[in-house]
């Protein structure tokens, strides 16, 4: 079938809106009509060429919502007409990782997904006979996409796709990191480095967890009003100080902050976040994705004296079994999604959405099909 899509033909180049061919779903696969998709920093990261797993030409997009059109052989968990959110972190329920009960990092389709392919090692997309790669198992920058059954969360059909599509990545990642990775407790102190969608979601999650002091940190003060709306008690612009942000936080509490979250992908900020964590029990959670080849460092004494460095992917959330409940929470107002959507656009305007993001003028732009 034909589908309009925004295709990245080469790194560092604007996306091109073209009509592509989408092949039918094979065994264990599902064809979806995408209704909405967010434009995320991870898409921009891959488009920049810095992503070690980036392959081109590719249909990007991984933060979407849509409706099932057709199912392949053996698919039982969804049927045509079901409303779904594609998952870049699958949940098969059968692999060693799923059965461990310790992680959400299912490996059922990981090997082929990282190569831009479907589980059988081929692609369902082509343009003028040339194969196009899939992206993160989702490829929501196409009006129609094919996704593995294990990479789909079935959601309430009454949910507003313009909002709940954000649960496909950023908001779930931030809120989940608070509850599942850090396990923030009432009255704990929290510092959030970077107030993009993920950082703001961390702030909201910290409020849900009834954290005491919630410190929001960003060099763009225009984001502070929204941070306060989501629950920040303090907003700090590092550029307002003539000393490192770590020292600013240690002035607030000489022993440090209970939980710090790095939501940028800057290895220097990752170190500052770790060294701002509370002596004896503080933990720092890395959520931001750093560029290819970059490494983190700190003095071992920082860990010897009780600090813990952690990472979080998709907020530790198991997509098929847990994400539908987060959609219900959003429908009840327990998760506030609407303020994240600062712009809505058509697919033809998608390059403008990337410009807004790079200029710091948007939190999330949602593309409507």
Swiss-Prot record:
Zn(2+) 1 binds at residues 40, 62, 169. The keyword DNA repair does not apply. Zn(2+) 2 binds at residues 92, 95, 98, 106. Its main location: cytoplasm. It catalyses: S-(hydroxymethyl)glutathione + NADP(+) = S-formylglutathione + NADPH + H(+); S-(hydroxymethyl)glutathione + NAD(+) = S-formylglutathione + NADH + H(+); a primary alcohol + NAD(+) = an aldehyde + NADH + H(+); a secondary alcohol + NAD(+) = a ketone + NADH + H(+). It comes from the Bacteria. InterPro entries: ADH-like_C, ADH-like_N, ADH_3, ADH_Zn_CS, GroES-like_sf, NAD(P)-bd_dom_sf, PKS_ER. GO terms for molecular function: alcohol dehydrogenase (NAD+) activity; S-(hydroxymethyl)glutathione dehydrogenase (NAD+) activity; S-(hydroxymethyl)glutathione dehydrogenase (NADP+) activity; S-nitrosoglutathione reductase (NADH) activity; zinc ion binding. Its EC number is 1.1.1.284, 1.1.1.1, 1.1.1.-. Keywords: Cytoplasm, Metal-binding, NAD, Oxidoreductase, Zinc. One of its GO terms (biological process) is formaldehyde catabolic process. It is found in: Cytoplasm. SMART domains: PKS_ER (SM00829). Homodimer. Has high formaldehyde dehydrogenase activity in the presence of glutathione and catalyzes the oxidation of normal alcohols in a reaction that is not GSH-dependent. In addition, hemithiolacetals other than those formed from GSH, including omega-thiol fatty acids, also are substrates. Also acts as a S-nitroso-glutathione reductase by catalyzing the NADH-dependent reduction of S-nitrosoglutathione. This is S-(hydroxymethyl)glutathione dehydrogenase.
